[in-house]
Each structure stands twice: as C-alpha cells, then as structure tokens.
Amino acid sequence: MMDLSPNNQIEDRKPILTADGLVQTSNSPFEPTISQETQTSNGIGGQCHLTVDQLDIEILPIIYDIVRCVEKDPLENAVKLRESQDCNHKIFELQKRFESAREQIRQLPGIDFNKEEQQQRLELLRNQLKLKQQLIRKYKDTEF
C-alpha cells in the first residue's frame, strides 16, 4: 500500500498480520517505514546490513604475533628497538582490527535493540507463526 507521509513523500506501507489476527497497515515499532529519499538524504541507505556469517573479524593471529613479540628478549639494543617498533606496529594493527570489528557489529540488524525489545519481538514473531500455522490448517481443512 502506498501512502503519502506528512512531508508528501511516498511511503510503502506493507500490511502486517498482528498476533490477534488483525491486519495492520501501519508499521510496527521495530520496523519503521522510511522512504528511499529519506534514507539517502540521512545517509542510512549507504549502509548494508551484515549477517553474523559475513563478519570479517580475525584478531587471533595478531594477538599470537604480539605475544610472540613480547616473549622475545634480545640482548642487543638495536634489536630491542626494532622488536619494540614491530610490537608497536602489531598493537596498532590490532587496534585497527578492533575498530573494524566495531563498525561491522554496528551494521548487524537488530543490534540497536535491548534485550527486552528483542524478547518482545521474538514473542510477537512466535505469535504470528502460530497464527499463520492455524490459518494454514484451517485453509487445508476447508473443503470447496
């Protein structure tokens, strides 16, 4: 269903089946409708949502390298200085990977919901599933 928003932009409002069996045309609080124009003007449209399987977080090899670097105890000052610089570089690389991981995690869908909101959403989805299963059973039992 296409409606005009208060600022005269076209919004796509999909009908939603509520837990009590009613069809609701306004969106749920968990999935707000934002027009494509509003998304791109707010900078939202550029972010794509990742899944957990798509996360690229590799920190163990760097941590291993840092531990190996710290365990080395060279006797010469020149070697100590070079090893110290290598360790600092690896630590900086680890910090960059942590920041990259934070950015990726921020793109996960639902990450901005707290535990209670997630539980409410899960309960709503379970109720919808039960209702749809009942409707399917009722439809299959109906003879034409």
Swiss-Prot record:
Residues 85-143 form a coiled coil. Keywords: Activator, Coiled coil, Nucleus, Transcription, Transcription regulation. SUPFAM superfamilies: Mediator hinge subcomplex-like. It is found in: Nucleus. It comes from the Eukaryota. Belongs to the Mediator complex subunit 9 family. Component of the Mediator complex. This is Mediator of RNA polymerase II transcription subunit 9. It comes from Drosophila melanogaster (Fruit fly). The lineage of its organism: Eukaryota, Metazoa, Ecdysozoa, Arthropoda, Hexapoda.
